[in-house]
Each structure stands twice: as structure tokens, then as C-alpha cells.
Amino acid sequence: VNSHLEHFGLRENPFEIVTDPRFFYASREHREAMARLAYLVDQQSMYFGMLTGEIGSGKSITRKVFTAKIDWQQHYVVELENSGFTFEELMTQVLVKSGQNRRDIGTNGGAARLFGLLTSLATELRRQQGRQLVIVLDEAQDLDPDALRQLKRLSNLNGEIDGRITVVLIGQPELRQNVAELPPLDQRISLRFHLPNLAADEASAYLRHRLEVAGRTGGALFDEEAVGLIYRVTRGVPREINRLAKLSLGGAAAGRASRVDRGQVETIVEDLRRHQSLPAAFAGPP
């Protein structure tokens, strides 16, 4: 543990930009997103869902927490953290993650063969285990139009086989436009939810939660004015809150302060502006 963490009684860095489910903060909107995704999966008759959000809004950590809570006795979940592939490559990864040998999948037959293998997988899961196949694709804005068109065909399988396939698309806002340009797929999206940034009244609880997970047992580490400035500068984007809070924490520790105050946050913000390290959207006055 480095010195500035020890200074504040922390076991680990509370503001690392990682998708560690322990640090998930269940804001009102994040709870709503998970409730809607759970409904989508549990219904087993709504074949496509779409969760979007700006970069840094917490989509990937929401995905991890959501899939961890799915009832695996009823559902078989396959997650792909990157969707920047062709349809054939994506479905091959789904099959490999489902336990099939890549050599057995083969390279001949293209999409038709992959559809056959997916049909067999979904049918086997339903008949032998009573489970539904759930495919979760993160960074889905990177899917090319052909892959999106092919994904739509998966919903057709639900009327043809003794199995069910639900696909959850997770991505940045441009995913919505990409889907809208393909009406046959757009019409199959049964659930849509856009994950907004944190509300102003949630910033303090967000920081406190992450600090407590990291080992903080004392009182509030960021004073009220510091929290307010962090929120205004970052516009409530969780990833940017983490970045500014981490730097402010380090600055406070270097000065042997017992808490992080507004002045310490201002120092970091001015330094970031001077080096043009704040996102363009946050470059104005706080």
C-alpha cells in the first residue's frame, strides 16, 4: 500500500478505473437499469435489449454486476467484453465460451453453420437443463452493420427451435443510431435504457461507498465543497469523478492534510486545465 493510501487508512486505491464489482455504486439509475435488464431476461419472450451510456457512465461495471446476479439455473450467460468483430467471429467466440472446441466449430459453412451450431446449443440448454441462452455484447457500438443485421436473424430462431436466445447490446450512444438505421433490428429491441450520469445528490454517497470498500472507516474524507466542485467539473461522469478524486486524494496526502477540501480540488483542476487533460466537455468554468 503506498504512502498516501496509508495516510488515509486505505487498504487499496478507491478510485482506480477498473470494473471491480465491489466498487459498484447502485445509484437510482443504475438500479433501474439492472431491474429492466433482469425483466428482459426473466421474461424469455423479449429477444433484444439495449443499454447505452456515455463513456465512463458505468455500463461495463453494471454489466458485470447484472450478469453475476442472473439465476444460472434458468439462464446460461455468455459475455463478450469487446464486439469489434465480424458476425462469424462473434458467434465463434460465443460457442467457444460455451465450451465448444474451436476446431470442432471449423471455418467452413460461414454464418449458416454458425446458426446451426447456435440452434443446437440453445435447444440442448432448454431440453437438457431447462436454461435459456443469454448473449451479452459489450462495446456493441463497434459492431459493423452486417454483424447487426445478422444478429437480428437470431430472433428468428426463437420461433423455430425448442430453445430461447436473448441478446443484450451494451454500448455508447452511437449504438442507438446504428440500430435505428436497421429497422428490422430496431423493431426487435424490446427494452431500451440510457444510463445517465450521477445526479448531484449522489456524488457524496458515491465517493463514500468507494472509500469504504477500500477500507476507510473514519468520517467523510471529502468535505462538502470539495464534493460539489468535483461533481460540477466532472458533470457526474463516474469515471471522471474517479480520476479527479484520485488526484485530489494524492494531493491532500502529499500536504499531510486530514481531509480533501475545495482548495485541493481546485489545484488539481487548474493543473489539468493547464495541461489540457480535462475532457473538452468539462473545460469550462466549474
PLM regions and their residue ranges:
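Conserved AAA+ ATPase "SRH/arginine-finger" region at the nucleotide-binding site
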Residues: L80-G84, V179, S190-A203
